[in-house]
Amino acid sequence: MRFYTNAYQKYDRILVRGYENGKRFKEEIDFYPTLYVPSKKQSGYKTLDNLWVEPIQPGPISDCREFYRKYSQVQGFKIYGMDNYIFQYISDNYSEQIEYDLTKIKLFSLDIEVCSEQGFPNVFDCAEEMLLISIQDYNTKHITTFGVRPYDNKRDDVTYIECNDEVDLFNKFLEFWEDESPDLVTGWNLELYDIPYIVGRMTRILGDKETRRLSPWGVVKTKEIEISGRVQLQCEVAGISIIDYLNLYKKFTYVNRESYALSHIAEVELGMEKLDHSEFDTFKDFYTKDWDKFVRYNIIDVELVDRLEQKLKLIELCIMMAYNAKTNYTDVFYQVRMWDAITYNYLRERNIAVPPKEITNKDEKFPGAYVKEPKPGMYDWVEIGRASCRERV
């Protein structure tokens, strides 16, 4: 059995991690994509319009992009084929239904705790010291916690690694991370807080070179994105899928909750709660006055996410969907990508080349419609209607 866990494009290569016969593999592939151009002969390949096309390989990925750039605007000359080269690579190498072993996929749930000397930590400056990092292995259930102060550990399923300071914490964490090499990391609000803060703070303390050790390929990228009118920071760690369990929960449970705080979701779904620390006036008082309880608080957070997955199986669903569509795990959040991959593979099996992608002006904006949030509940005499209007010229 051979299956991938992540495929990442870097220049002209596809960087692939996965498992073969139970053992981890890691490969760098020089990839030569296949495109299709109109043909006058019966080549065995057609378009959706029933026109003959023939396959060509202009060269590596960079040459294919240059070929697109050069000929896409030529009138009457259409270039067919999948231009997402990761999807094309996966389809080329996994043409049959993908068989996979969930027990081999290394899934971590992760949570961090940070100083709050100046209020809630900010991922854009990462000015506050990292105090704790906890990780739970989903398959073994073992928890490893890195902390900067002594802790009285009384649990056999927890390994507490006491660190001299923050620099020592990051160094020991990186050693563990490289040795264990997770395939998929999850957590609650992980994508917009825990991972960006680890990356930002580590870069500030250890430098960019050391931070790149987070990726098995040495590639860590950060970008700003806008969500609900707010600018957020998002990190990409090449070779590792970062799946926010909060986003999974919102997308695949099909329920509306009055709050999406982990404490509320854990209570609703599991009948469990985060560790209460209301006896302290501030979060700073919490970690300065009762370190042992503070560590337990951090550990419980990774356990709650792990138990949510045990019950809901949303990561399992995500993995199944990705392999069915032949995509990366993170692509399940993007409906267009998923349908692109599904359609491409369906047509490929029938020797039909996917049509060329229409080039649009991304700067052109269109007025959007107001979307009213529905009120969940049972209703009688429901009507479904659609209204449209056209501006009078």
Identify the function of each model-found stretch.
Residues F3-Q9, I14-K46, I86, N93-L184:
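Conserved RNase H-like, two-metal-ion catalytic cores of nucleic-acid enzymes
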Residues P182-L190, M321:
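Short glycine-rich phosphate-binding loop at a beta-alpha junction
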Residues E99-Q118, L214-C235, Y344-K362:
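Extended, Lys/Arg-enriched charged tracts that mediate electrostatic binding to polyanionic substrates
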Residues M1-D83, R204-E236, D276-H277, F294, ...:
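Non-catalytic nucleic-acid-binding interfaces of large nucleic-acid enzymes and RNP effectors
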Residues I143-T145, D152-Y160, N164, S181, ...:
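Active-site-proximal helix-loop-helix substrate-binding element of RNase H-like nuclease domains
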Residues D281-I384, S388-R392:
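Common nucleic-acid-contacting/processivity interface regions adjacent to the catalytic cores
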Residues D194-R204, S388-R392:
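Short active-site loop/helix that positions an aromatic residue
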